[in-house]
Amino acid sequence: SEWLQSLAALSPDAVVATGDFLSHVEGISSALEALNPLMDFPGVFVLGSNDYYAPKPINPIRYFSGPSQITPSRPMLDWEPLVAGMTAHGWHDLTNAQVDWKVAGRLISVKGVDDPHISRDDYAGITRSFNAAADLALGVVHAPYLRVLDAMAADNAQLILAGHTHGGQLRVPGYGALVTNCDLDPKQARGLSHHRSCALHVSAGLGCSRYAPFRFACPPEATLITLTPRSSHLE
């Protein structure tokens, strides 16, 4: 919590939060307290599956057979106060939505979806297109499933920001992630890559399941991204 709060000292122009703020029925106040210094800056957010459902024990080997599944035995979390707390500070809720976002004198057209990991995404239902007059077309999603990345790329997104993968959580030195808990290639589990015509950045995030509270060769992270204008004179 203290480390997350200390990130405000970086004075970012804006904050993009890609979900999984919670994992416990009593986690809302702690999450909002940790985010409070960052909420002094403009922000947008989406939710992840752990904001809707409490985690349960799972055999880690299960992840090698494909993405984990949400079962009826996982209790629902009271996520509405979390959303209310962030929007009260002026952050934009990107749950299957598009917003035009003024940041540091620039216009960013942003489209986000609810978490594809639990099939709450509805990109086709976002009736507003990216603003053609914007300086940047930005897509935001928690779990970087290919169906959403494909839709955003086809919609002319220039940059997509995602989370969910924990960077693989357990990485093999010299090789990288073994799993992503979605259908994204493990080689793209962390950091900057490309998907079709747009840049993709997947954050390894800060935490992990309380039932698997460890990482290996994959430290928690928050990423400070600097965007620069593309020169029309580049050869």
Predicted regions and their residues:
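Short, conserved loop/helix-junction motifs that constitute active-site signature segments
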Residues: 10, 35-40, 130-133, 152-155
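Core catalytic region of metal-dependent phosphoesterases/phosphodiesterases
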Residues: 2-102
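Short, Asp-centered acidic motifs that coordinate Mg2+ and/or phosphate
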Residues: 13-14, 44-45, 108, 136-138, ...
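Active-site metal-binding loops of divalent metal-dependent hydrolases
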Residues: 19-21, 49-52, 97-98, 113-116, ...
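Short beta-strand-to-coil "C-cap" segments at the C-terminal boundary of structured domains/repeats
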Residues: 225-232
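Conserved beta-sheet core of the metallophosphoesterase superfamily
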Residues: 144-223
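Binuclear metal-dependent hydrolase catalytic cores centered on His/Asp/Glu-rich metal-binding motifs
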Residues: 58, 64-91, 95-97, 103-150, ...
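Short acidic-hydrophobic surface loop/beta-edge motif
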Residues: 97-104, 189-195
